[in-house]
Amino acid sequence: MDIIFDFYNTLAEVRADEQRDETWSPVERFYRERGMAASARHVRRLYGEFWRRRLDRLKAEGRFAYPELDGTLVFKDIALVYGGALDDGEAAEVYRVMRGASIVTLRAFDGAAELLEKLRTRGARLFLLSNAQSAFTRGEIDRCGFSDAFDGMLLSSECGVRKPDPEFFRMLFGKYGIDGKTAVMVGDEQINDVGGAAAAGIRSVWAKDGAAAHAAEILELTEK
């Protein structure tokens, strides 16, 4: 069978604070090192403004009910305000700088890796479907020890759509040949994961305390 996992707060505990000054000081430094007269407070304000503006445009286009933005574009927008420019690599780098400075907690839940291994030995295929930014999430998956855990994954920033939009689920199904009749979604969020799975026509496990805390229920799926 195919089991689809969310990542953040399902397999790994994460807590980030984008409002504290320590988050934006290294971002200011990043721009200044490239000749742009940025200030941490101004960059933080621009980040929020440009994010909302770009997301509003995506919503107006109407392609998806729940569109997703590639956040690296926001950092390119910010550079233009200061008369500069960032290429794709630099935009991803400054996003990782901001993210790294914002992280308070990032760790795999105890027992999560063991759960995935048990599912694998029982013949399950494992997939990841996450509302996440590719610029930093793939690195965080590696840091938490899950780099080789999945048969495939999709991140919302790479697809332009996010959970609970059923189209995001269907993209995963189509790319990896997942059978929606037997697939199960495991996630901590009732709306995005459980509600999204229902909209896509698949079963789900609401792992509100993380997947490892619901290991018995998840493992039981492979016995049916």
Language-model features: where?
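Asp-based, Mg2+/Mn2+-dependent phosphohydrolase catalytic module
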Residues: 1-5, 13-17, 32-41, 89-91, ...
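N-terminal helical cap/lid subdomain that shapes the substrate entry/recognition surface
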Residues: 1-110
